[in-house]
């Protein structure tokens, strides 16, 4: 059975962005492009209505590319259960209150039984301290917490 993965907006942005001269960003872009075909071949891949909203912002041509890139993936709606869990993640200081969208990405994935959240957002999602806090909050609410990782980490896992 395929693993259920959730693509957060930063991953889409790296996939569709023009090649960067910054070595770190270029490495992220390369890992994302290497992972992209596997998202439909090896995984049940999901995005949310929030990813659609975020991907549609900014330069119209780039927004169109981002929206086109995520079109093959299944979309998860944002429901009251996800909104409530996102509020609890923020209240528990798992995600800073200035970034409610990040808490909502996690909550949508959690309430829909997603196994892995893929993101390049190391500041508020994919760092050890956030992962520990979020896991504690989510599990205290009676849910199973998905793993949060970068595209590079998922590639190295080889699943």
Where in the sequence are the language-model features?
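Residues at the C-termini of beta-strands that transition into short coil/loop
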Residues: 49, 79, 152
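Electropositive, surface-exposed helix/loop patches at the edges of structured domains
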Residues: 149-159
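A general structural signal for short secondary-structure junctions and capping/turn motifs
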Residues: 36-38, 107-108, 138-140
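Short, well-structured N-terminal submotif of metal-dependent ribonuclease cores
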Residues: 1-47, 54-67, 73, 91-97, ...
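A structural signal for short, well-ordered beta-strand segments and their strand-loop junctions
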Residues: 6-7, 46-48, 117-119, 150
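C-terminal end-helix/capping segment
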Residues: 125-147
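Acidic, metal-coordinating catalytic cores used for nucleic-acid/nucleotide bond scission
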Residues: 53-57, 123-126
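Active-site neighborhoods of divalent-metal-dependent phosphate/nucleic-acid chemistry enzymes
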Residues: 73-133, 155
């Amino acid at each position: 059975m395929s693993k259920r993965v959730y693509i957060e907006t930063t991953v889409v942005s790296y996939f569709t962005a023009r090649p960067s001269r910054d070595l770190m960003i270029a490495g992220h872009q390369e890992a994302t492009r290497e992972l992209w075909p596997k998202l439909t071949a090896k995984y049940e891949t999901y995005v949310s209505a929030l990813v659609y909203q975020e991907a549609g912002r900014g330069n119209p041509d780039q927004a169109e590319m981002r929206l086109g890139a995520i079109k093959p993936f299944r979309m998860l709606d944002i429901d009251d259960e996800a909104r409530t869990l996102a509020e609890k993640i923020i209240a528990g200081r798992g995600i800073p209150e200035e970034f409610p969208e990040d808490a909502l990405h996690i909550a949508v994935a959690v309430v829909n039984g997603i196994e892995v959240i893929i993101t390049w957002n190391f500041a508020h999602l994919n760092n050890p301290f956030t992962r520990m806090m979020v896991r504690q909050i989510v599990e205290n609410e009676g849910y199973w917490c998905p793993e949060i990782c970068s595209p590079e980490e998922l590639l190295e896992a080889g699943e």
